[in-house]
From Swiss-Prot:
GO terms for biological process: queuosine biosynthetic process; tRNA modification. It catalyses: 7-aminomethyl-7-carbaguanine + 2 NADP(+) = 7-cyano-7-deazaguanine + 2 NADPH + 3 H(+). Homodimer. It comes from Rickettsia conorii (strain ATCC VR-613 / Malish 7). The active site is at C179 (thioimide intermediate), D186 (proton donor). NADPH binds at S83, K84, R247, G248. This is NADPH-dependent 7-cyano-7-deazaguanine reductase. The keyword Acetylation does not apply. The gene is queF. One of its GO terms (cellular component) is cytoplasm. Its main location: cytoplasm. The keyword NADP applies.
Length: 273
């Protein structure tokens, strides 16, 4: 189904009853082909973490319940879910009666698994769950005094390295791109951990800033950055985690790693979530 038939970028009416058909799938293979990624032999492992903040239903007495959800879509799923369709789908539960929160969780996980063709995991939390904010791990490179003049398209030629081997973690809050269809800004904090030739911080920061006017989905931006770093320095280990700011009641946080037994860098929200 072409992206032009989705609800993204169009005026939409919220359904007042549960409707799984609102979920719009996008094959990962389309964007991966553009990046030269073989979908049958992925160079990474990982997940897309979706945090959802507009989640409500009715209990058996008709009383509303509200909560938040976190869902993990495996990076080897056949499809991703278009974000606006997911928002509309979640809001279709607003007047839907469920026996329990566990039942709501089961329905959503099953629907997401069916649409993505993968085993989606996750959990729904009560609205009064205590939340702690975290900060990205590693060295922040944002205060470097650099001159930037490339905002047209991501430029991987900006990635330079030193002929010395390191194992380190760096981060930046200056990643920004735009939604492929609506053009709305996606603001991201990126955490990069790697073992290999040392990235030159100044040139790498320029590379990240070159995404500023790029029109791509969050997942594709993550895989482009992963691929560009991998091609530039051939690291023994590489992971990237991008935590995007909340937009439309959802934030998307792609994680990619060369390590099959990966663990996410942080389970705490950053301040822009």
């Amino acid at each position: 189904m072409p992206l032009s038939t989705s609800l993204l970028g169009k005026k939409s009416t919220y359904k007042d009853s549960y409707d799984v058909t609102l979920l719009f799938k996008i094959p990962r293979i389309n964007n991966r082909n553009e990046l030269g990624i073989n979908s049958n032999n992925l160079p990474f492992y990982g997940v897309d973490v979706w945090n959802t903040y507009e989640l409500s239903c009715l209990n058996k007495n008709g009383k509303p319940w509200v909560g938040v959800g976190t869902f993990y879509i495996p990076t080897d799923s056949e499809n991703i879910v278009e974000s606006k369709s997911f928002k509309l789908y979640l809001n279709s539960f607003n007047n839907f009666v469920v026996e329990s929160v566990k039942e709501l969780e089961r329905i959503i996980l099953q629907d997401l698994s069916n649409v993505t063709h993968a085993k989606v995991t996750g959990r729904i939390f009560p609205i009064n769950t205590k939340v702690e904010f975290g900060v990205p791990s590693g060295k922040n490179i944002d205060d470097l005094d650099i001159v930037c003049n490339n905002y047209g398209a991501p430029d991987n030629s900006l990635i330079e390295y030193e002929d010395v081997l390191v194992e380190e973690e760096i981060n930046s809050h200056l990643l920004k791109s735009n939604c492929l269809v609506t053009g709305q800004p996606d603001w991201g904090t990126i955490v990069i951990k790697y073992k290999g030739k040392k990235l030159k911080y100044d040139s790498f920061l320029k590379y990240l800033i070159s995404f500023r006017n790029c029109n791509e989905f969050a997942e594709q931006c993550a895989e482009r950055i992963f691929t560009d770093i991998k091609n530039a320095i051939s690291p023994d280990f590489l992971s990237i985690y991008i935590v995007y700011a909340r937009r439309g009641g959802i934030d998307i946080c792609p994680y990619r790693s060369t390590d099959k037994s990966y663990t996410l860098p942080s389970d705490k929200r950053f301040i822009r979530q």
